[in-house]
Amino acid sequence: MKVWKRSLPVWLLTLVMLLTACGTPSQPDQPDGTETWREAYEETGAYLQAQTAPTVGSIGGEWAVIGLSRARLLSDETAQSYEQTVEDYVKQAGSVRLHHAKSTENSRTILGLTAAGYNAANVAGVDLTAGLTDMAYLRAQGTNGPIWALIALDCHGYDIPQCADGEEQTTREGLVAEILSYQCSDGGWALMGDESDVDMTAMALTSLAPYQEETDVKAAVDTALTYLSDAQQADGGFMSWGAANSESCAQVIVALTALGIDPAADSRFVKNGASPLDGLCAFACEGGGFRHSDEVWLPSRASTHWPPATASGRARHACST
């Protein structure tokens, strides 16, 4: 049942992965990058709209729904088709947990449904938030589990149901504390170990953004922002796992806007006149879409991180929505 308009907080939109097949990289045609951002935004929106109906899954699924919704390009027909696909998937799963070990399956689907305008707490009679009630289950997926659970639960202020007997009750306070406990000594967050990664740091900041006024959270955020500023490349972009790529730029843009920071103007994130938006648009392709990196082309994936990243940046810069 549709229960609300398709809108999500800008900070939420860290979710979408920017991966696509594309042709020739587009080139900036205005010094401030405004026209490049606008063209990349519009062309990639058209590209995504032309793809097949979204499924349940990381590729061609929730990230596409979220991106199209944020860009106000998600049609009623596509939203309804996606919701029905999720209903069928949930019925087949036969559990409030969509995966026995990956809580992010629930988190991602909650985000997709909410973006499409549906109540994730009632999907064919199943409350998908009930799959996130056990902290031990979330913790089993490492850093990702608590981060995405908090983002999903906060995306529409979902109540957290009571956990089953013998489980460790999930609370927002507990999730924040868990995420803070993962912060590395250099100020960032890592997928594993103590060597920080730009993507994980940006995701953690996005999840913590609604709590940034709390003293311990603010201290962690300030340290992480210093880490990200130091990690930024001379062209405004970012690297992850040893390679400059579009996803890292997009993740940072969304994290900054979630925190109320203008990624196009904040001096900490403008290097040699180039911002993260310039870094992102360096991967834009003529005709729509973004490539993963200069070396890697991924024909099986669709560009779905562009709408939140460029929309968030444009909202604080020269482009209009």
Locate the predicted segments by residue.
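Preference for long, amphipathic alpha-helical scaffolds in soluble/luminal domains
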Residues: 2-4, 22-321
